[in-house]
Amino acid sequence: MDREYKSSLRCLKIGDKVAELPIIQGGMGVGVSRSSLAGAVAAEGGVGVISTAQIGYDEAGFEKDQAGCNLKAIRKHIWMAREIAKGKGLVGVNIMVALKHYKEHVKEAVECGADVIISGAGLPMNLPELVPEFCRTKIAPIVSSKRAANLILKMWAHRYNRTADLIVVEGPEAGGHLGFSRDQLAHRDEMDFDQEIRDIIACKKEYEEKFGREIPVVVAGGIFDRKDIDHAMALGADGVQIASRFVATKECDADERYKQAYVNARKEDVQIIQSPVGMPGRALCNPFMKLVENGRIPVKKCYNCLEKCNQGQVPYCITKALIDAVEGDVENGLMFCGANVGRIDKITSVHELMRELAEG
């Protein structure tokens, strides 16, 4: 690879695909990780990930046809990310199981030749059904426990005679939607998540033997620097997924005010919220979240984003809240973040961040 910095980190192999650096940039929606960020990460030899959640929010006609605009934007941003990457790294997509048009997003990503589909916010039980085994696109579930990992691997093997190409193990320090109860998150310091990672690595070995292939494990949630990467690798992981740090980069697709809110954030500004998705999430405390705590914000328009959403009962419209934030209204929008956002102190470039992580 023609970058000027070297790294002792080994490459990440996902089947027949190889990322020179074992660093996946986590998918962030709405609109936070699209082609600009994902393409820049791939250009550095990592895995750039586009979030498909309401990805077409700024396409003409979105107010009337969210589904069509999102599919159009998936095509556009995968193509644009590849143009930026110039053949380096890998370009993947993150598709939430909770999305109303989950199947359509998966099929569009496959048709567009995404290198990998990473799927969470629910368990992607039918993902192998939607992704042909011999196409170029790899499939990766996000899990937060050995129980979830075993459930998916067992189900995929039994129902589809398939297994995961990659497993993302997301811990309790992650941002966005979390695969833990509020009680678990409140007592996360008592949790031995390192052991959970080891258990998942042990669990997947049965399926590696059964299918005659390696299933790399990538650790996510609270990964901030090279020390964290080395720790994950020492546990037996093959790579890491990092999201929040990539928000504070010039290439991130969010508004500059969104990025600056990350830089300005303190540890005490982070809170656990209840998302309309039905899962706990981690986000920045702001006037919007205080309004939500005092009572629901009536939903004036439905954007048809979630499979299970009762417009008359949800505490607020998650689509509107996320779009407001990514467009720069950081006081009145929802800003997901990881537990370590308070450690971010500047906006840098993807190149410099990847160099820092790679060189240590």
Regions found by a protein language model. Give the residues of each.
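Active-site entrance/lid segments in N-terminal catalytic domains of soluble metabolic enzymes
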Residues: 1-210
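Conserved active-site-proximal phosphate/metal-binding subdomains
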Residues: 24, 174-218, 224-360
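Residue-level detector of alpha-helix initiation sites
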Residues: 32, 223-224
